[in-house]
């Protein structure tokens, strides 16, 4: 009898334990996110934490499993996930270029049915809702905005210190090199250790000027070649920039993250980067500190590279759809995971996040059309970058947005070789054409 009672007690304890364990089970839907985050950028960490924690609060049935990476580390991890067929549920992606393999392999879900169902298409700039602008040929992601990949920052304080004015053309720029050098300044800063930087932020603009606005279309249609004189001349101009000392060869060894600090420290008169980089200079809401204080930001002018001799056009920059968010095609249709993954994409590109991202410097030209810019507290450099579109007349292609990686990576490497005087422009052009012919 005692044994029976003991057994019943043990059984009761086990049943209670099972109930308690069941009650403690986390039944939330886990959304795995691969997020692109430069932790050192002002507001970046705090803003990301706010966006994702707010989403979880508003959607108690969801748990966000977020992995934060930046630059090449991000792209390497994304390729690893794709190769292993173990995609994140939601990810930060490019409309082409460095995410081309995700588009080509159809690893991203078509968002068109969700966009149409929720009636949000008219809340975005029409270009960002055009599927032909994405390499997949369908709405594989929702872009945060429009990106100008070439911006030319001018430090008036440095120029004034040596009695110079902003250069209007390349000849004036070359003439400034010895004056600036004698005073301990570099002329143009561009952190080019990551090979995409020179291609995206400088050479795409240069190629457009030498070859004309539609040059990439003619090459892809095989009506023009990379070995044609105009493209070779564009490549040779990169060599000339370094040969003339306009850009010091040491810049090839500068990490991308170091560029803003160098410019803010008055190490150079000019700085080349994309429009997004303004976010690195503004005030961090947590610390109250800025790389360049709002008062000193009035000394920074933002436009495009001065006129270059021998080109077909000037007053131009390179423009492309901005980065944005996508869902893995592998998510089962109609599942709770799909439901919440879409809600997260919609939230990250929605009005509330877009307004905060714009005000905090993350998106200079947002894709949303319903934002209240008048209520935003924008610093001088943010206003200047917002007006960048008025500083040039022609928008040309970004190379890694119109050619596959097997071609643009050869260009990327070739630009570094030109900077270091290791190859001629003609030799690089031949290598690029060979890569294109092998497609």
Label each PLM-derived region with a short phrase.
Residues 80-81, 88-89, 119-157, 186-187, ...:
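A structural signal for short loop-to-beta-strand junctions that line the ligand-binding cleft
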Residues 34-38, 51, 98, 205, ...:
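Extracytoplasmic/periplasmic substrate-binding proteins
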Residues 70, 94-151, 165, 174, ...:
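Hinge/lid segment of periplasmic solute-binding proteins
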Residues 20-105, 117-122, 166, 285, ...:
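Conserved N-terminal structural module of periplasmic/extracytoplasmic solute-binding proteins
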Residues 143, 219, 319, 360-371, ...:
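C-terminal capping/gating helix-and-loop segments adjacent to ligand/active sites or protein-protein/ligand interfaces
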Residues 134-144, 150, 174-223:
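Extracytoplasmic/periplasmic solute-binding protein
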Residues 177-179, 220-251:
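Glycine-centered hinge/linker elements that transmit conformational signals in sensory
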Residues 24, 39, 97, 108-110, ...:
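Mature extracytoplasmic/periplasmic domains
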């Amino acid at each position: 009898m005692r044994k029976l009672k003991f057994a019943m007690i043990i059984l009761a304890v086990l049943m209670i334990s099972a109930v308690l364990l069941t009650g403690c089970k986390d039944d939330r839907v886990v959304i795995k996110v691969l997020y692109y985050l430069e932790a050192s950028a002002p507001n970046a960490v705090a803003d990301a934490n706010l966006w994702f924690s707010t989403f979880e609060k508003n959607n108690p049935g969801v748990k966000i499993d977020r992995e934060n990476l930046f630059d090449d580390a991000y792209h390497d991890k994304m390729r690893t996930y794709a190769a292993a067929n173990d995609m994140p549920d939601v990810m930060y992606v490019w409309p082409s270029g460095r995410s081309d393999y995700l588009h080509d392999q159809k690893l991203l879900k078509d968002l068109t049915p969700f966009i149409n169902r929720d009636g949000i298409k008219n809340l975005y700039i029409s270009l960002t809702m055009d599927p032909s602008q994405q390499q997949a040929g369908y709405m594989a992601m929702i872009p945060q905005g429009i990106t100008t990949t070439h911006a030319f920052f001018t430090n008036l304080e440095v120029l004034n210190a040596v009695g110079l004015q902003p250069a209007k053309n390349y000849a004036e720029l070359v003439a400034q090199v010895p004056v600036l050098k004698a005073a301990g300044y570099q002329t143009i800063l561009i952190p080019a250790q990551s090979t995409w930087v020179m291609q995206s932020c400088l050479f795409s603009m240069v190629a457009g000027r030498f070859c004309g606005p539609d040059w990439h279309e003619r090459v892809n249609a095989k009506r023009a070649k990379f070995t044609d004189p105009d493209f070779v001349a564009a490549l040779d101009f990169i060599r000339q920039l370094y040969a003339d000392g306009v850009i010091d060869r040491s810049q090839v060894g500068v990490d991308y993250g170091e560029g803003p600090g160098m410019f803010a420290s008055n190490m150079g008169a000019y700085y080349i980067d994309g429009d997004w980089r303004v976010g690195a200079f503004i005030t961090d809401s947590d610390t109250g500190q800025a790389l360049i204080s709002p008062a000193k930001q009035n000394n920074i002018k933002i436009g495009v590279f001065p006129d270059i001799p021998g080109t077909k056009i000037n007053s131009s920059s390179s423009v492309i759809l901005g980065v944005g968010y996508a869902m893995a095609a592998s998510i089962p249709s109609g599942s709770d995971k799909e439901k919440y993954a879409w809600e997260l994409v919609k939230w990250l590109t929605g009005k509330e996040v877009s307004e905060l991202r714009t005000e905090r410097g993350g998106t200079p030209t947002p894709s949303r059309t319903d934002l209240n810019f008048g209520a935003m507290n924008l610093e001088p450099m943010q206003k200047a970058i917002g007006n960048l579109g008025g500083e040039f007349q022609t928008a040309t292609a970004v190379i890694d947005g119109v050619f596959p990686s097997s071609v643009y990576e050869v260009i990327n490497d070739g630009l570094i070789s030109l900077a270091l005087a290791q190859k001629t422009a003609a030799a690089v052009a031949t290598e690029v054409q060979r890569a294109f012919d092998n497609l």
